[in-house]
Amino acid sequence: MAQEKNLKKYSLDGFLPQADMQYIDQIRGKELQKYKELLFDAERDGFANQLEYIGDMPYRPSKEIKASKLGVGMEVLDHREAYDFDQTIKFMRNSGVKWARLQSGWQRAEQTPGVYNFDWLDHIVDSLLEAGIIPWFSLSFGNGLYMDVPPCRGSYFYSPTVFGEKGITGWKNYCQAMARHFQGRVSYYEVWNEPNANFLQKPGSELSGKLVAEPPEEYVKLVKVTSEALREVQTDLKVIGGSISGCSLCNEYIQGLFDAGIAEYIDIFSYHPYEFIPELYWPSRLQFIRDRIAESGKHIEIWQGENGFAVKEREANQARFLTRRYLTDLRLGVDMTSFFTACDFRNGYKSTGVFDFGIIDAQDPDCYKPKLAFRAMQSFTWLFDEDTKLTNVSFEIHPYETPWAYTTRPVDDLYPVVCGFRKGNIPIYAYYHPSHILSSYEARTVSIQMYPERWSTFEKPVLIDPITAKIYRIKNETNCSDGNYGRFRQFHRMPMLDYPLFLTDATIFTEGLENFKYAQREDK
């Protein structure tokens, strides 16, 4: 038995902040016009009978969010000085992220033996803390004062441990100087960056025309030296190890790290799972790491420490990737996830042009501006704060008007990712198709079947598009009752895209909203 009903009309007037049209035009103006065919629009894409636009997603400054798992990379501000931090922080204050990864810049901080200049890093750290963002350091890279070899691409991608007592002592002194100087401000220290991806290479290997990475044992030796040096100064800090690049299957390297005893020296294991399809292989690699940690008998968190996507001519591609990267890590229970990176790199990274992995556009050095991915980030940080918890849900996607049992359509054509969260008693359901980021994907019409849990409030269903930041009222639903299967709710004629859409209750925007402060935008 099925009974379709029209849902009561409601609005969010008075509960959402007034739209700042100048800001919306800045983000959506030329960019949205240029890429309009790539972005979902309920009316244009044929879903107006089911979806009614009722408002835009709010945002919260990072300072107004107590805690979350969402972070951003702010790397390459060391001797390479790849972008203007002060222009970038204006935007990041309103991003909602709570973590920022920094590279410590030994080569920039110590240019005379034993003399450390942290003024530039003080400014960055203090600005982030004032914005409500927790900085964490990647201790990298080497320093020519202690390494008797020429730099590689302007940096010393060599382990201090292979340069004898001189290299080890110089590195230990530097790490301890960092810990003393930033004690009380920074408590998380990562050892190096991507040791398996030529950022920890054998000295001289570049001269042969083929870069050779140091073996896992050498990296673990560096981790041991670093961890012991740091803890002599600050016993309660957290040491992060691994920083593994995942461009290819690297389980052998990871196994080598644990065989060499890395678990004895770290509190957090970090990983960089680069793929064009963020859902591909990451769950199995994550489980491989969890199994190695379990074998060690240690309590070690796992962070997704760096992963991003360049614009590649279309801002929407990057925005799609950000939403899928964040959601993949959240649904798999990763303890922190960092998107690479905050701002395009203009200097010190490529010989020419702009390295456009940033969610802030730096094409014009005098006028930085946010990309679509920045707005998507704001949507995510609003939804996924310390009160939002991963939960099991009864939530299914089916071909529109055709049950799976009676269709001959290939499963791969419609195979969705689905997951659920709860914010108090309000459910948040997510669903999408995990296609290749660069593929052409048109909105598909599906039916959603769900059984709301007893704890949930779900009387005013809305659909959220995190990239366009639009909120839609769902107009119709069908309450189904069957003697064999019991009762469930069904929403027909719903869109499925290649990035997450969120189905939740409108009260998520009204309950307790008086506690949220909507600051004046500082990034116009």
Where are these regions (language model features)?
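Surface-exposed beta-strand/loop patches in extracellular or lumenal glycoproteins
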Residues: S435-T457, P495, E511, F516-Y518
